[in-house]
């Protein structure tokens, strides 16, 4: 296996524990796996070199293409491509499979066991216009928890370990879209914590089904509708946990 970027504190452990271990169990030899994360649109020289010289059955794990701008012609040189961020333009490619964003390092390890929830719903994240609309819709729904930071990866954001405690104590976790794509780390972190992600449709579609398949999420038409659906579970949290 080779890597072209430091997977650091973000989805590094998710990749190693789930994705790469599955490849190792299924294929036996990871010498043909390349994990790539970068900002440039064109494939890096290392990807091109890897695709040219490594033998057949090469696997590319492509991260970081949040704005769906990376050139993907190189995909045809790999037997299998796993990538973050669903792109409908790649649906026809039989060698391309979607990966969720995974979780940050503090959410690594076994999933939380089911327990009584301290919060019916929670949200921890940065302040944005669409999130203000979301929180306004949930303002009248009691037993919620909200923590707003000044920005993504900012000095005042919660420590991941503290965020995990909040999610583990929440029946539902509100999961608005990220900066440029519907998917965020928050979705898998909620699942890893034993909570139910609450999402809304994008352009009238449940975009998460293209990555997660038949998932257990709350999928609403808008945030007002989402609040109504969550409110319906207020007096039956065990049913919500069983979703």
Model-derived regions: residue spans:
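Nucleotide-sugar donor-binding catalytic core of glycosyltransferases
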Residues: 1-215, 219, 237-240
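An acidic, carboxylate-rich microenvironment
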Residues: 162, 225-228
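Conserved donor-nucleotide binding/catalytic region of nucleotide-linked donor-dependent transferases
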Residues: 228-243
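Alpha-helix N-cap recognition
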Residues: 219-225
